[in-house]
């Protein structure tokens, strides 16, 4: 049984059909990366799994249990199993670094502040940040350090499933490589299932076990990361090599 099973996922906004029947599985302990250009439905797919958006049709099962339509305490219990690294880090500038890391523990799980701080320091250490940054405000940190803090927050409650939204956006190549290494380290160390969305092929190659390509609201290819450069799929070939000419370009021009 897959950890995550998505079938026939559809979502439209007014006349704009974003998801047109998305299907994929993610095995337990696997790192799936969903690639695709801007506006192809990557973020909408993640938001549907998280319950931030309600799909118009389709099924999303976690460990064989349907999650579409969950609300109240049932939704809250499901969310406790998730961790999320947002594209812009999404840290609270009014809180100290350790309070950002511990926010979900204190507010969502009722963990006492002293214990939550200990956990926060432990998770900061796991992403290469020392105790000296704990009392600082996020604005006092570099973009790369903020991303590390956000990763520490994502793993603070030791979730079963981690979601990464464009984890290396805005980072220089060296810091992006650091974040990619930390993602792999955290995913493997915790034994969690991971779903990432990105258009960064360097990041994809480093963190993915399997890759799915989303185009015009459908998965057009799904396979092992090792096969990405010889997929035999014209959409994938054009995207990963950054070629202007190809089926993606032709369909955009015809739209």
Residue ranges and their predicted role:
Residues 162-165:
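Catalytic Walker B motif of ABC-type/P-loop ATPase nucleotide-binding domains
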Residues 65-66, 113-132:
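Conserved ABC ATPase "signature" region
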Residues 94-103:
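Short coil-to-helix segment of the ABC ATPase nucleotide-binding domain corresponding to the Q-loop/switch region
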């Amino acid at each position: 049984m897959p950890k995550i099973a998505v079938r026939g996922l559809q979502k439209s906004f007014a006349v704009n059909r974003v998801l047109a029947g998305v299907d994929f599985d993610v095995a337990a302990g696997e790192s799936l990366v969903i690639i695709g250009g801007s506006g192809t439905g990557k973020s909408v797919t993640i938001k549907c799994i998280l319950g931030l958006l309600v799909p118009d049709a389709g099924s999303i099962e976690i460990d064989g249990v349907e999650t579409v339509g969950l609300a109240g305490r049932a939704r809250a219990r499901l969310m406790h199993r998730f961790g999320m690294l947002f594209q812009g880090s999404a840290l609270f500038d009014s809180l100290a670094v350790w309070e950002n890391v511990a926010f979900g523990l204190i507010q969502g799980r009722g963990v006492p502040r002293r214990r939550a701080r200990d956990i926060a320091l432990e998770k900061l250490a796991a992403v290469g940040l020392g105790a000296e940054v704990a009392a600082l405000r996020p604005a006092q940190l570099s973009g790369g350090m903020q991303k590390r803090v956000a990763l520490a927050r994502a793993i603070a409650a030791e979730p079963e499933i981690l979601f990464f939204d464009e984890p290396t956006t805005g980072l220089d190549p060296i810091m992006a490589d650091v974040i990619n290494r930390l993602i792999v380290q955290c995913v493997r160390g915790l034994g969690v299932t991971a779903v990432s969305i990105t258009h960064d092929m360097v990041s994809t190659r480093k963190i993915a076990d399997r890759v799915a390509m989303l185009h015009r609201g459908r998965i057009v290819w799904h396979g092992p990361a090792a096969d990405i450069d010889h997929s035999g799929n014209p959409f994938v070939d054009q995207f990963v090599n950054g070629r202007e000419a190809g089926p993606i370009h032709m369909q955009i021009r015809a739209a």
